[in-house]
Curated annotation (Swiss-Prot):
CDD domains according to UniProt: RNase_PH_archRRP41
InterPro entries registered for this protein in UniProt: ExoRNase_PH_dom1 (IPR001247), ExoRNase_PH_dom2 (IPR015847), ExoRNase_PH_dom2_sf (IPR036345), PNPase/RNase_PH_dom_sf (IPR027408), Ribosomal_Su5_D2-typ_SF (IPR020568), RNase_PH (IPR050080), Rrp41 (IPR011807)
Domain of life of the native organism: Archaea
Source lineage: Archaea, Thermoproteota, Thermoprotei, Thermoproteales, Thermoproteaceae
Enzyme Commission number(s) of this protein: 3.1.13.-
One annotated GO biological process: gene expression
Top enzyme category: hydrolase
Example GO molecular function: 3'-5'-RNA exonuclease activity
Metal-binding found in the keyword field: no
Protein name per its UniProtKB record: Exosome complex component Rrp41
Primary gene name: rrp41
Native species: Pyrobaculum islandicum (strain DSM 4184 / JCM 9189 / GEO3)
Function text: Catalytic component of the exosome, which is a complex involved in RNA degradation. Has 3'->5' exoribonuclease activity. Can also synthesize heteromeric RNA-tails.
Keyword Nuclease: yes
Signal peptide range: none
Amino acid sequence: MKKPPVPLFQNGVRADGRAPDQMREVNITVGIVSNADGSAMVSYGATTAVAAVYGPREMHPRHLSLPDRGVMRVRYHMAPFSTKDERKSPTPTRREIEISKILREALEPAVVLEQYPRSRIDVFIEILQADGSTRVASLTAASLALADAGVYMRDLVIGVSVGLVDGAVVLDLNGLEDQYGEGDLPVGYMPNLKRFTLLQLDGAWTRDKFLEALNLAIKGAEFVYQKARDALKSKYMTIAEDIYGR
């Protein structure tokens, strides 16, 4: 493995100045895509994901519909300008197809698809800027976009990442930590139900480090959840003020 250009962890401090259990700055805006039924933009530091939801609506072609539940389709895509790597083909990459499937499976436990028989819900996610943790930022954005669309949900799904960097368990991996760390653990968590919907383990973890990582992921998800709730409330308070006056 290549050495990182800078030390990733020294004297209890990460290369970007954060403590091990500290998220990057989290910014969330709901209702950012005007022609979508629901949308959200989520930034974890420099990583920015925009999600737009269309539906529930009638399934076409009809033979793909299910009589007892709706179908959710998720498309994850990285904008050509989101990374320094040159992207020549608009065709989805193998990684984008895989992450699309992972995100759909992480969102489905939170969505009451039984309320929407013979219907479909389309979720489109665009990564505008990538600096680590893109799939978990996408998960949070997609969950908020579904809520903004008025889709029946059991809980929000909050995505966070935890990793091993120079033997330390750290929260919210940036690009350097994602590239040069010894392990990573993307997590999807429903804070009210206290259930995980996504756990992907990469690297060599001891049992103790893994349990430490799970606890840190829950802490991070609960922090982001408060930001997500505030963003949803802010949008609908603004709408109410526009309708009824201040």
